[in-house]
Amino acid sequence: TVEDRCSGWAVDRAIRTALGNHPDSPIISLCGDTLGGEAKHLTEALAQGDTLAQDILIGVTRDLAFALSHVTHLFHPQVITLGGGLSLIGGPLRKSIEEQLPGFLMEIYGNGPQIKLAELGEDAVPVGALLL
């Protein structure tokens, strides 16, 4: 599912999987010995130029761009707004999706819809649920 591949938990899992293979990576040192919540360190690791963090981001956003291509083909939105905890990555998340999405779209859709980040960030989900 999208949740399995494109969520904060998916990023946590990817970081834990990489622990043994990349012990010198900045993201590994940022995470320390804590188990859970590793995704919150991705933004800082990206700012430090960590190639492992970049690879993890590209993997997650590739899967998310593929999922959003289906949304685009079915509903033709002009804008897709990303919320939830993963959106806290900010600009790097948005940019990576914008770069990868066109590769999954039929030519007629061009670069696809504009990708925006929800102003509510990780509070988007509970606020949306309360409004139902």
Q: Language-model segments: which ranges?
A:
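ATP-binding/phosphotransfer module of carbohydrate and carboxylate kinases, centering on a glycine-rich
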Residues: 1-132
